Amino acid sequence: ASHVLEEMSYDNAVDILNELSKPKVASLLTLMNKDKANEIKALLHYEEDTAGGIMTTEFISLKSTTPVKEALIHVKEQAPDAETIYVIFAVNEDEQLVGVLSLRDLIVAENDAYIEDVMSERVISANVGDDQEDIAQLMRDYDFIAVPVVDYQNHLLGIITIDDILDVMDEEASEDYSRLAGVSDIDSTSDSMFKTASKRLPWLIVLTFLGMITATILGSFEDTLSQVALLAAFIPIISGMSGNSGTQSLAVSVRNISTGEINEQSKFKIALREAGSGLLSGIVCAVILFLIIVVIFRQPLLALIVGGSLTCAMTVGTLVGSMIPLVMNKCKIDPAVASGPFITTINDIVSML
């Protein structure tokens, strides 16, 4: 196993070692080449979900004062071991990041020029402690194939490449989908039934208590329902449509937050749009339900009550579904926690009212 790890890139080796117990990691490192083991040890000190945890130290950097002719030779020598050669970073004598250039820039430059003549000084970098999700957003916004990682003194420590970010995006998406389903952690096929249940129980217990509120509200209308028994038949439709519309707006809201499309100025506009969308959808569905009740049951008054209730429930449900993630994000809580079951239960309470 140690020989396999030696042949892997440092960041991939770290990913594997992070899944093992500390004694196992220590034993594997002692069997590896000393220099490679030291590089991996340094990377293992960083938190898994930070820039330091996913960066690699196998990259090409050049002194800004290096002549282009010498730089080409250096790149050719370092290329076999580098994670990528398409982006090259320039540093000063103190190993601080000062510029960036592409392999194309280097190839087309005059041989008597220097790196500082062809590099761009406008470098966007990540701090070693930045969250991996923020790095993914950064690379998505700027279409980077690699981003440099620096410390607080701007010393170049490593780079994060696009293949690592794709893994991060997949991991974050799986985590968000899991939370949207009301599961505290991602289920694994190897988990026991007890472990699986323990992941799902917290939200289910919360939803049980919220469901009791719904039952209490419904019980308070016992006299009304006894007089118009047919009204009870349409309660599932109203609560279901409220939950459906809320879940739709929730998914859109969480996605907009994760992609950075929502800012302070756009929140009111979004709330207005979602309320309007819920109202229009509610009116259309209410008209359809109104006609069905009139044709089948021949009770226009009941049709009017049910239609009006459906319109109000869908309007409020859509608004609640879009605003709860925004409020949670404002409170520095992961908006994906506002799961589908949670929103549905809240909207059940609203529809009962």
Model-inferred region functions:
Residues 169-319, 323-337, 341, 345-346:
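Alpha-helical transmembrane segments and their membrane-interface boundaries
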Residues 346-353:
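Hydrophobic alpha-helical transmembrane segments in multi-pass integral membrane proteins
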Residues 46, 59, 87-89, 107, ...:
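Broad hydrophobic/π-residue packing in well-ordered secondary structure
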Residues 1-180:
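Hydrophobic packing positions in regular secondary-structure scaffolds
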